[in-house]
UniProtKB/Swiss-Prot annotation:
This is Bifunctional purine biosynthesis protein PurH. SUPFAM superfamilies: Cytidine deaminase-like, Methylglyoxal synthase-like. PROSITE patterns: MGS. One of its GO terms (cellular component) is cytosol. Belongs to the PurH family. The keyword Disulfide bond does not apply. It catalyses: (6R)-10-formyltetrahydrofolate + 5-amino-1-(5-phospho-beta-D-ribosyl)imidazole-4-carboxamide = 5-formamido-1-(5-phospho-D-ribosyl)imidazole-4-carboxamide + (6S)-5,6,7,8-tetrahydrofolate; IMP + H2O = 5-formamido-1-(5-phospho-D-ribosyl)imidazole-4-carboxamide. Keywords: Hydrolase, Multifunctional enzyme, Purine biosynthesis, Transferase. Its EC number is 2.1.2.3, 3.5.4.10. Residues 1-144 form the MGS-like domain. It holds the Pfam family MGS. PANTHER family: BIFUNCTIONAL PURINE BIOSYNTHESIS PROTEIN ATIC (PTHR11692:SF0), BIFUNCTIONAL PURINE BIOSYNTHESIS PROTEIN PURH (PTHR11692). It comes from Clostridium tetani (strain Massachusetts / E88).
Amino acid sequence: MIKRALISVYNKEGILEFAKFLEKNHVEIISTGGTYKHLKDNCVRVKEVSQITNFDEILDGRVKTLHPAVHGGILAIRDNKEHMDTIKDKNIEPIDMVIVNLYPFFEKIGKGLSLEEQIEFIDIGGPTMIRAAAKNFKDVVVITDPKDYKRIEEKLEKEDEIDFNNRKTLAGKVFNLMSAYDGAISKFLLEEEYPEYLSLSYKKGKDLRYGENPHQTAAFYTSLTEDGAFKDFEKLNGKELSYNNIKDMDVAWKIVGEFEEIACCALKHNSPCGVAIGDTLLESYKKAYECDPISIFGGIVAFNRKVNKETAKELVKIFLEVIIAPDYDEDALRILKGKKNLRVIKCNTKPLDKMEICKVDVGILVQSTDNALIKDMDVVTAKKPTEEEMENMIFAMKVVKYVKSNAIVVVKDKKAVGIAGGQVNRIWAACQALERGNNSVVLASDAFFPFDDVVKKASEYGIKAIIQPGGSIRDKDSIEECDEKGISMVFTGIRHFKH
């Protein structure tokens, strides 16, 4: 039976209606600070917590509920005679429900606050109360999520009590929230990429229909401590996004984000099948399409500019799963919405991932994101690349790092006409890419050449320039082969393995 409730919330959403429901059901309400004023101003009968503690708020509100009169009422086990005799002796009344949500520490990260200002959003009293209530969940109902108000209200109307399983679930939500909250504070204060204990503060955005395959379950979570592209994207049309859609969108968006020029990326099964730069958006799309007109079918297309009417007309000529771009003009959106299942995504934030996380059995691997920029290009051959070849080399290297190793990309006119990856040896990747991209000019490799066979094969297909990290004990063999065949080659010193 719920007789007394303590309410202290930063987020006032729905609290007035819930408090009025409790009042109607003869529940005594105790409250603090701004919540007390909000309820009182809206004609809810409420006691200020200082009336219970006989102790005023102090230290600018830092100490309000940290008092035995509050925590004794929460933590007392009702069927423990000693506990109940103790609180009776101390004139402490039991508290049966605790409704608390916390200062918005998550929301204030990255908003330009000083250290002192951010620290003021570290909640102390709230976490202490909800942890206490969660520990004693058999006797105390604890609510931290405004979405639960209606459900609990319906439960009380129907049964006049909250059952054990619901109490346990609500308690579990407390510790789930606190692990994320404390993790965010720890990350903020430590400022370490690899702390001794790793806590990830993510919140579920939505359950997904299934994972990579229909027999796998899945959900999508977003970071509570970092902003980024996929925190605020907007779906303007089409079916719900799937697990595979979101994974593919991530890679495609990162690829077009590599370029200042107008760029388009076509992607399938997490691998680019066409990437191009154009003078116009339509040209960039047509060039990307020409890279692999077969694989683009049923894929994802990303742009780094607003989609216009002319480009939209071309896009709807084939079956695509997703289109992602910073924006769409009115005519373009109308055309794309003509395909009711086509997912049209608006995303105007650049990718901001700083770390990558990979799950392995009973552990995770964490590494910094591969954001290395080419700073020095060492021409190691007698022949020097032309300015145009150098531009194509840089373009090719930006693409190849997103292709699963072993990866080879061949390019002509800033168009990735041959992309091959996921091969267990480099020559196989080279053969596939060159076969697809006959008459290309530049070849890029994600890692060094262990032998000179890639150079030999490249020369057969008319490649004029090669860019690769270098670093093989047989680099000399590849350099000599390039010199013999009249090919220029550049070493970057930066490897781009992708597993």
